[in-house]
């Protein structure tokens, strides 16, 4: 039985995420999230791993948890919007895309995503 702590699991998952092994990254990140469910860095990394492995519903759940806990986290709103769009929930996605774009008008990627959703 492993005695790895949340930080070690987060570090391992982050390394796998950066290496492009998204499915494998979710395993230690899920374990880290179970140990530290309120750690935003772990939840964000897990959401990214789910999104990049096309597990969009699970990604949306992670980013929604971040938004609930940290409503001014522009990146969480942006990622939640992207995840919701991939699940076909465009109306919900528009709301989060608009929030992210309004929070960070300097982010051209946020603006482009918001504009694309508004015209679709």
Residue ranges and their predicted role:
Residues 3-35:
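Alpha-helical segment of the N-proximal tetratricopeptide repeat
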Residues 19-30, 53-65, 87-99:
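Structural signature of tandem alpha-helical TPR/SEL1-like repeats
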Residues 74, 82-109, 115:
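TPR/TPR-like (Sel1-like) alpha-helical repeat modules
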């Amino acid at each position: 039985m492993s005695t790895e702590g949340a930080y070690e699991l987060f570090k391992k998952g982050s390394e796998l995420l950066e290496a492009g092994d998204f499915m494998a990254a979710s395993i230690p990140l899920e374990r880290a999230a179970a140990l530290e469910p309120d750690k935003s860095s772990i939840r964000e990394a897990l959401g990214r791993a789910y999104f990049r492995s096309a597990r969009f519903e699970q990604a949306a759940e992670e980013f929604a948890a971040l938004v609930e806990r940290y409503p001014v986290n522009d990146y969480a709103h942006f990622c939640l919007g992207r995840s919701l769009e991939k699940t076909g929930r465009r109306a919900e996605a528009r709301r989060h895309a608009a929030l992210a774009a309004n929070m960070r008008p300097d982010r051209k990627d946020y603006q482009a995503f918001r504009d694309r959703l508004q015209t679709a």
